[in-house]
Amino acid sequence: MFSSYKPCEVGVPQGSILGPLIFLIYIYDLSYELDCQCEQYADDTTMSASSQSNEETARVLTNNCEKVSQWMSQNQLKLNPDKTHKMTVGTSHRLKSQDANICVTMDGFTLQESIEKSETILGVTVQSNLKWNTHVSDVRNKLKKRIAGIYKIRHVVPFQTLKTISEGWVNSVLVYCLPLFGGCELSDLKDLQVIQNKVAGMVTSS
């Protein structure tokens, strides 16, 4: 049984098997319109720029934001202002100074600073001061329920099965993007080590 045909004149049909691939083709040329660093994954796009002065950084980002706005208009897409914001990255001392306030505008509105001074990019929480305590806290909270599940079944399933479950449920989360945040403070690393030791103890004593 086949559904009836329906023309799709704008955008990409959602729920289709080829939808993700078609969408990537649809936005493929966006990065070529920009003259700053641009990272894309699915429908998320991150632009970044740096220079010797905040004024120059603001100018570069504002110009590229306008290019994005024009590209979206040409492709009949609409920007969501609530999901579009900026984050200023630097040392804690620099961020506290007045010089850290960079004004970037796009499509007639001023981009607001990220809430909590952090952004989650592909599952990694990046803080504006480039510390990782927030990400480590997120990892710890994510693993709490998983560890509780392993604890309940530790005497029910065989050792090899429990080992496989722990590697899939816990280790995969611990090592995800580890080279990126592996240089965090020692106290944060100890928190992760405690989790790893706890799971290892559950598995070996099963």
Question: Residues of each region from the PLM?
Answer:
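Basic, alpha-helical interaction scaffolds
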Residues: F109-G182
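Short, conserved non-catalytic motifs in the polymerase core
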Residues: M1-I22, S48-N54, F109, E113, ...
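Active-site palm subdomain of RNA-directed nucleic acid polymerases
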Residues: S3-Y5, P20-A49
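Short, charged alpha-helical motifs in flexible N/C-terminal segments and linkers
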Residues: S69-T88, R94, T120, D188-S206
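Mobile genetic element proteins and their domesticated derivatives, centered on retroelements
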Residues: G15, G19, F23, L30, ...
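Short, conserved micro-motifs composed of acidic
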Residues: N63, L77-K117
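Catalytic palm subdomain of template-directed nucleic-acid polymerases
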Residues: G11-V12, Y28, T46-S73, T91, ...
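Hydrophobic packing residues in well-ordered alpha-helices of helical domains and bundles
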Residues: C38, A58-L61, C65, L79, ...
